[in-house]
Amino acid sequence: MVSQNYLGVMSGTSLDGVDLALVDFSQTPKLIAADFTPMPDTLRVALSQLVKKGETSLQALGELDHQLALLYADSIQRFLAKHQLNADDIVAVGCHGQTVWHSPKGQYPFTMQIGDMNLLAARTGITTVGDFRRRDMAFGGQGAPLVPAFHQAVFSSPERLTVVLNIGGISNISVLNPNQQTIGYDVGAGNTLLDIWIEKHLGKRYDANGEWARTGKIHSALLALLLDEPFFQLPPPKSTGRELFNLEWLEHKLTQIKPLPAEDVQATLVEFTVQSIVQALRQIENPQAYPCVLLVCGGGAKNPLIMERLQTHLTDWQVSTTTEYGLDVDYVEAAAFAWLAYQRIHNLPANLPSVTGATQAVSLGAIFPNI
């Protein structure tokens, strides 16, 4: 039997590392194996500085493009060895690359992901599909979010209103409403500000289980300032990233109130993440009064404090994780890029115009052959 295995490779806005998900598409998409490779500190810092400043030299940009491809290739080779697989066992790799800038508005809209796919295909010996977002933008879309199309394929049900919530660096939702077009969009800062703040004050990469945030108190004045951001008033479809929600943005907000203990800021940031999600969910129309199910994935799904606060606010929703529905919370996005590669190899449309704003559904990505 010919293999229908596709490997999704994803490094997100949190810059913590590379997620890999091997998915079998011979029948219903099935996650076969998954893994994670931490991002080296030097590379993470360089990428973080690039995203934060929005400027660099062509030399530095080119070198980061090369380094990322090497990281992806090494991650794939380790994955193959660990799971006793050969390159021939995989039809194609779907690699997102690393977003360093996303600017869907303006006279010349563009998005930029780096990580040389030519080098990745050559190093792994596996046909690679990359550069997914720009084709959607070429047809008038925002190039994001792309994952809702995968959510629709895997999680939709005619008997319920399902919202898939990914809390990664940025929080985004896919609204799978029976008898309506699927919509999906970014709703605010996910883990980005939480991670930035704890790294600044405690030198840690993230707040494990929300333990530090639990020691602080929610500050209502700061929360109101954070929520008073024009992005939240924009109608969907909309997208955002670290170019908005970053340390400079947060520190500017903090200058407008009296000094607070760092742990109180962290507690308030958790509530900010949760409230931005809750506000978005409250705006979803449900005229048929379908049962409402929230499926959470991404790093935030493993933060008990975030999950508790969501359940506190959403008493009329069933709050679950995608793991309970068959897809590990850590690897939903990586699995989505395996699906995007499958769609491209088969010349099938992979964007949802109702989500991205594109004028039509098209296949996404460029194919980089292994030879």
Curated annotation (Swiss-Prot):
What GO molecular function terms would the record report?
ATP binding; kinase activity; phosphotransferase activity, alcohol group as acceptor
User: Its domain of life?
Assistant: Bacteria
Gene3D superfamilies assigned to the protein according to its UniProt record, in alphabetical order: 3.30.420.40
UniProt keyword ATP-binding, yes or no:
yes
The UniProt record lists the EC number as 2.7.1.170
Q: Which residues cross the membrane?
A: none
Catalysed reaction, written as an equation:
1,6-anhydro-N-acetyl-beta-muramate + ATP + H2O = N-acetyl-D-muramate 6-phosphate + ADP + H(+)
A Pfam match: AnmK
Which keywords belong to this entry?
ATP-binding, Carbohydrate metabolism, Kinase, Nucleotide-binding, Transferase
An example GO biological process term is: peptidoglycan turnover
Give the enzyme class: transferase
Pathway named in the protein's UniProt entry: Amino-sugar metabolism; 1,6-anhydro-N-acetylmuramate degradation; Cell wall biogenesis; peptidoglycan recycling
Q: What InterPro entries does the record point to? A: Anhydro_N_Ac-Mur_kinase, ATPase_NBD
Where along this sequence does the record place binding of ATP?
Answer: 12-19
**What this chain does, per the record?**
Catalyzes the specific phosphorylation of 1,6-anhydro-N-acetylmuramic acid (anhMurNAc) with the simultaneous cleavage of the 1,6-anhydro ring, generating MurNAc-6-P. Is required for the utilization of anhMurNAc either imported from the medium or derived from its own cell wall murein, and thus plays a role in cell wall recycling.
Q: Which HAMAP family match?
A: AnhMurNAc_kinase
Family the UniProt entry places it in:
Belongs to the anhydro-N-acetylmuramic acid kinase family.
List the PANTHER family hit by this protein, alphabetically: ANHYDRO-N-ACETYLMURAMIC ACID KINASE
Q: Report what the protein is called.
A: Anhydro-N-acetylmuramic acid kinase
Record the organism: Glaesserella parasuis serovar 5 (strain SH0165)
Give the organism's phylogenetic lineage.
Answer: Bacteria, Pseudomonadati, Pseudomonadota, Gammaproteobacteria, Pasteurellales
